């Protein structure tokens, strides 16, 4: 069920910022999916990018004065992302060899183009997700309508799940250690 809301100028500005963040996340995930060497990482980036597209649609609805219902289940795809992170160390070693070989191939080709490693792509997206999640955390307290706050809180939780999926992937590949 969709309800209508009248937004303040400040709320509109905050949503415009969120819209820009979501658009940038969509672009980054799309680009990084193409740049990633590991198929598992490509899948994480693809799934996260699809969720970012949903977030953008939700933000656009809010900007048009419509508050969408947030009772649809979206945790299934996030749970499958998290489980993708737990692959064997044999695959992890193979992915590192492929990544190292890609870097060597890039260096020996004589081109000056930069080829980001999967770790660099993950690190950048993890920082991006941390930032975007924190902006939602701040924005939530600036909205007077409880339903809008609930929608923004829902998006923030999904942003945290994106970061969790990237973290789990990085940890499973030996790219990140929380200790």
Where are the predicted features?
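DHp/HisKA dimerization-phosphoacceptor four-helix bundle of two-component histidine kinases
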Residues: 20, 47-54, 124-127, 154-161
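Conserved alpha-helical segments that form or flank metal/cofactor-binding pockets of metalloenzymes
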Residues: 39-97, 160-174
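Acidic, metal/ion-handling microdomains and their immediate structural contexts
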Residues: 6-7, 17-52, 56-57
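Membrane-interacting alpha-helical segments
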Residues: 1-12, 61-80, 101-119, 171-179
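Acidic/histidine-rich alpha-helical segments that form the ligand environment
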Residues: 11-35, 90-154
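A detector of long soluble domains/segments in diverse envelope-associated and cytosolic proteins
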Residues: 15-19, 33-35, 158-179
């Amino acid at each position: 069920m969709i309800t209508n809301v009248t937004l303040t100028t400040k709320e509109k500005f905050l949503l415009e910022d969120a819209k820009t963040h979501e658009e940038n996340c969509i672009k980054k995930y799309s680009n990084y999916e193409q740049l990633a060497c590991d198929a598992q990482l490509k899948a994480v980036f693809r799934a996260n990018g699809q969720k970012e597209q949903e977030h953008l649609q939700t933000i656009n609805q809010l900007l048009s004065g419509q508050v969408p219902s947030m009772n649809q289940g979206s945790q299934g795809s996030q749970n499958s992302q998290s489980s993708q992170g737990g692959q064997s160390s044999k695959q992890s070693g193979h992915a590192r060899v492929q990544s190292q070989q890609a870097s060597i191939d890039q260096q020996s080709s004589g081109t000056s183009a930069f080829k980001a490693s999967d770790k660099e792509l993950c690190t950048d997206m993890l920082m991006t997700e941390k930032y975007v999640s924190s902006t939602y955390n701040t924005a939530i307290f600036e909205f007077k309508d409880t339903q809008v706050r609930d929608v923004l809180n829902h998006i923030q939780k999904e942003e945290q799940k994106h970061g969790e999926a990237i973290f789990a992937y990085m940890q499973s590949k030996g790219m990140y250690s929380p200790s």
